[in-house]
From Swiss-Prot:
Function (record text): Promotes mitochondrial protein synthesis. May act as a fidelity factor of the translation reaction, by catalyzing a one-codon backward translocation of tRNAs on improperly translocated ribosomes. Binds to mitochondrial ribosomes in a GTP-dependent manner.
Organism: Neosartorya fischeri (strain ATCC 1020 / DSM 3700 / CBS 544.65 / FGSC A1164 / JCM 1740 / NRRL 181 / WB 181)
Protein name, per record: Translation factor guf1, mitochondrial
Xref: Pfam families: EFG_C, GTP_EFTU, GTP_EFTU_D2, LepA_C
EC class: hydrolase
Binding-site positions, GTP: 75-82, 139-143, 193-196
Domain of life: Eukaryota
EC number: 3.6.5.-
Length: 683
């Protein structure tokens, strides 16, 4: 204020001022804008200027909490979840009708692959019987590798649309996602999609749902998400069937109906209780958090505290996804929206998924929410920058992506061959592949990725157990090996669905991959559900690709963790002139050693440049050589200037050359370029 008064006095006195005072004018005026800017930014971090309230915000404010509905769409891959989401957004006026295609699939990799990778949210307003309802839709992934996304989405929902393709019927991930939703107590509404296809058999699909899930199919809705047929019947069904309750599973409400009268999805009058559901990084705003408000309300300028870290933040902005970030003045109990802090979170690790936030001063009055179960990474790869100078850029890129996907584990490691890098853990091979694509597309990272491997459990003779995720930590020397009681590998229970005509080929494939059959049943006259217990190591070795090839693309696969079983596990290494190449080493079952060893030496030979001496490439387990290839040296013609008849001189020169090559091989280092590793490790 004092600066403003001084500026005003100077301006009023300026006409009478001397030339000297005029020369000072640029200094005062130049600093004035900087003063106002800094003051405004300082004030903005604590409070916000009053903004005109939009019509959308007025409509939301007028909707009581009893007319909130949170629901998601559950289905197998490619059964039409994202397309149905588009039609619902058009129906509610959230987006304009027209050429909308997977509006909620926002990542480039999702649009390229045609699958949903991240669960995306959107708020909608729908008028039913003359009353507005606030609907919160979650479009979930269908693939098993993104199960963590699905389970987090269910936590903020009261019900789900169980979507089945009328032409394909129930598939493996339909079954898996149904049981996941059922365990969470969600109210399930059967929906048959793609009824406009010539091959559609909606009655057969309904019969499958009734027999497999014991669902009441009388209220099932037959739709075509592509054409919009009957989509208008879905939202009234959602409003009438899905409850507006969030603290207790639906089955408890059914057992105790009085509970529903006293336990709505939240209370605006209570202190703030806010759950962090997801987070992502914005280059301008920093870390943005997707939150579910259970109690109270949150506004920009308020100070909140994290129960997990104890750190305090000022809220910079709140809003809803409609379908993009749409600022609001307040988020109330029962709503799902986004917030970001000003100043923002300094480290990505501060945004802990499942964390509870409340207003500063109310920590003792609020009970934190239980949060989410941490998923376990079961597929591991090593990632290295192609150029060692880009390590910091790769680290920043990985941290930003991990902010958006907390099921990934990150650990620094180094390799003599490839330098500094990271050991990354994923939920599956598709999860790994999508992460690699996002690193390249969104951050321009040039990386070398090793083939996927699975963890092993070492049980020592003294009773201790240790999980090994890196080949570098595997006990291979005789002294350590003598202290090991047994080595175990993880198994999974795989559920495969496919037409009956491919049964023989699928069983043959499973047996060839060390599988053990658990059950076989027909859920229709032509469709089979086959359950096999398989080693996870076999599953990540392109098992799904082989399954698709055996069934002409008609099979589907889902799996869940089973148990650890004892196996003959060894460390396979690649040796170049007897020196191990640490970046390539893998932990494998003994049955895979010979096949992999021969593949390695043959492929690696193609990418190693010839030297002045012989280069020997070997695959080895311990001291046993499994396979070998040799790169012949450049040949120098030492006999070029020699007379043809001088036999003794000829022999002497050849012996000297031979001895020289031996010395070179003994002391010479084989120079292997990064591009050779990149080509070797490429699929």
């Amino acid at each position: 204020m004092r600066g403003c008064l001084q500026l005003a006095r100077w301006l009023s006195a300026a006409p009478k001022g001397t030339a000297a005072s005029l020369t000072r004018a640029p200094f005062v005026l130049a600093n004035a804008p900087r003063f106002f800017t800094s003051s405004a930014s300082h004030a903005g971090s604590r409070s916000t200027a009053t903004k005109p309230v939009s019509d959308l915000e007025n409509r939301i404010a007028a909707i009581p909490i009893e007319r909130y509905r949170n629901f998601c769409i559950v289905a197998h891959v490619d059964h039409g979840k994202s397309t149905l989401s588009d039609r619902l957004l058009e129906l509610t006026g959230t987006i304009e009708p027209g050429s909308n295609k997977q509006v909620l699939d926002k990542l480039d990799v999702e649009r390229e692959r045609g699958i949903t990778v991240k669960a995306q949210t959107c708020s909608m307003i729908y008028n039913h019987n003359g009353e507005d309802y606030l609907l919160h839709l979650v479009d979930t992934p269908g693939h098993v590798d993104f199960r963590a996304e699905v389970s987090r989405s269910y936590a903020s929902c009261g019900g789900a649309l169980l979507l089945v393709d009328a032409s394909q019927g129930i598939q493996a991930q339909t079954v898996a996602n149904f049981y996941l939703a059922f365990a969470q107590g969600l109210e399930l509404i059967p929906v048959i999609n793609k009824v406009d296809l010539p091959s559609a058999e909606p009655e057969r699909a309904l019969e499958q749902m009734k027999n497999s899930f014991e669902l009441d199919t009388e209220n099932a809705v037959m739709v075509s998400a592509k054409t919009g047929l009957n989509v208008e019947k879905l939202l009234p069904t959602v409003i009438e069937k899905i409850p507006a309750y969030g603290y207790f599973p639906v089955y408890l409400h059914k057992l105790f109906p009085l509970l529903t009268l006293t336990s709505p999805i939240g209370d605006c009058k209570k202190p703030l209780r806010m759950l962090l559901v997801d987070s992502w990084y914005d280059s301008y705003k920093g870390v943005i958090c997707l939150v579910r408000i259970f109690d109270g309300e949150i506004r920009a300028g308020q100070q909140v505290v994290s129960f997990a870290t104890g750190l305090k933040y000022y809220v910079g902005e709140v809003g809803i996804m409609y379908p993009n970030e749409t600022p609001q003045s307040v988020l109330r109990a029962g709503q799902v929206g986004y917030i970001y802090f000003n100043p923002g979170m300094k480290r990505s690790k501060e945004a802990k998924i499942g964390d509870t936030f409340t207003r500063v001063g109310f920590e003792k009055a609020v009970e934190p929410l239980p949060g989410f179960e941490e998923p376990k990474s079961m597929v591991f790869v090593a990632a290295y920058p192609v150029d060692a100078d880009h390590f910091e850029h790769l680290e920043d890129s990985i941290n930003q992506l991990v902010l958006n996907d907390r099921s990934i584990t990150v650990q620094k490691e180094s390799s003599e061959a490839l330098g500094a890098g990271f050991r990354l853990g994923f939920l599956g091979t598709l999860h790994c592949s999508v992460f690699e694509d996002r690193l390249r597309q969104e951050h321009g990272a040039s990386i070398i990725i090793t083939p996927p491997s699975v963890p092993v459990k070492i049980i020592w003779k003294d009773g201790k157990e240790e999980i090994i995720t890196s080949p570098a930590k595997f006990p291979e020397d005789e002294e350590l090996r003598s202290k090991v009681a047994e080595i175990q590998e993880p198994y999974v229970l795989a559920t495969l669905t496919f037409p009956e005509e491919y049964l023989g080929k699928v069983i043959e494939l499973c047996e060839a991959n060390r599988g053990e059959q658990k059950s076989l049943e027909y859920f229709t006259a032509t469709q089979v559900i086959l359950k096999y217990e398989l080693p996870l190591a076999q599953l990540v070795d392109d098992f799904f690709g082989k399954l698709k090839g055996s069934t002409k693309g008609y099979a589907s696969l889902d799996y869940e963790e089973s148990a650890w079983q004892t196996g003959n596990i060894v460390k396979l290494q690649l040796l170049v002139n007897k020196a191990p190449v640490d970046a390539v080493a893998r932990i494998v079952h003994l049955s895979q050693v010979e096949r992999l060893g021969r593949q390695w030496v043959t492929k690696f030979k193609e990418h190693v440049d010839r030297q002045l001496f012989e280069v020997v490439i070997q695959a080895a387990v311990g001291k046993k050589i499994i396979a070998r290839e040799t790169v012949k040296p450049y040949r120098k013609d030492v006999l070029a200037k020699l007379h043809a008849s001088d036999v003794s001189r000829r022999r002497k020169l050849l012996e000297k050359q031979k001895e020289g090559r031996k010395r070179l091989r003994a002391v010479g280092n084989v120079v292997i370029e990064h591009k050779a590793f990149q080509a070797f490790l490429a699929k």
